[in-house]
Regions:
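Cleavable N-terminal export/targeting peptides
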Residues: 1-29, 195-199
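Short loop/turn motifs that connect adjacent beta-strands in outer-membrane beta-barrel proteins
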Residues: 24-32, 66-78, 112-118, 154-160, ...
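Residues that define the transmembrane beta-barrel architecture of outer-membrane proteins
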Residues: 31-33, 51-57, 96-103, 117, ...
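Transmembrane beta-strands of outer-membrane beta-barrel proteins
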Residues: 33-39, 76-84, 119-125, 160-164, ...
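Transmembrane beta-strands of outer-membrane beta-barrel pores
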Residues: 39-45, 63, 84-90, 125-131, ...
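Extracellular loop and loop/strand-boundary signature of outer-membrane beta-barrel proteins
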Residues: 45-47, 92-94, 131-137, 172-178
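Gram-negative (and chloroplast) outer-membrane scaffold detector with strong preference
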Residues: 57-131
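Outer-membrane beta-barrel "beta-signal"
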Residues: 59, 153, 181-199
Length: 199
């Protein structure tokens, strides 16, 4: 029940924030930087241990590395990002594990903006350290592989982001068994793109 209330609250907050933003930021551009704080959560799906929910919050720093490339609707800019997740909770049947994560590999494709929307695709990888084994009976050290699709909603001073994220957590064979956890999450963030220097 808690996970459904969380998803409803995130959806309502996203709709309210979308209505309250106005056009202002130019969005990602070469040489620019992104700073963002975010929070998200979701529930397990098939392919690993079930009956598990995840909540997390963190900070992102990104570097927009390219000018626009590719034709048509694929046109966009490449961004490299790192995420720190000092808040990470895994609600599993045996216990609740608390920990922190670090994603040093964030590969993000920022599509050309459409009005005040700047959609993106992203692949992320990192590590997770928890006070209990995740999943139960395995290991407290895990690796996280993630894929996300979302959009920035550009405002006058800040941008909001709303995304759907798939996260796979496993110990990569550090312990046996290695069933892993697969979750689908909704993430909401607030941040800012800082312009690059003109050359």
């Amino acid at each position: 029940m808690k996970r459904y209330l969380l998803l409803r609250a995130l959806t309502i907050a996203a709709l309210w924030l979308t209505a309250s933003t106005c056009l202002g930021q130019s969005g990602p551009e070469k040489g620019g930087h992104e700073i963002q704080v975010f929070a998200g959560g979701g529930h397990s799906v098939s392919g690993g241990r079930g009956s598990t929910s995840i909540l997390n919050a963190g900070l992102r720093y990104g570097w927009v590395l390219t000018n626009p490339h590719l034709p048509g609707f694929l046109r966009g800019r490449f961004e490299y990002a790192v995420d720190a997740l000092p808040v990470f909770a895994v609600f599993q049947p045996a216990n609740t594990a608390y920990g922190l994560g670090f994603d040093p590999l964030g590969l993000k494709w920022n599509f050309e903006r459409r009005g005040r929307f700047s959609p993106y695709l992203e692949l992320t990888g990192g590590t997770l350290f928890t006070n209990h084994n995740v999943p139960t009976g395995t290991n407290p050290v895990n690796f996280m592989d993630q894929a996300a699709f979302g959009t920035h909603i550009l405002g006058a001073r800040y941008n909001w982001s709303l995304e759907l994220r798939y996260m796979h957590i496993s110990n990569a064979g550090l312990a046996t068994p290695n069933p892993g956890i697969n979750t689908v999450q909704v993430r909401l963030g607030i941040g800012k793109f800082y312009r690059g220097h003109s050359r």
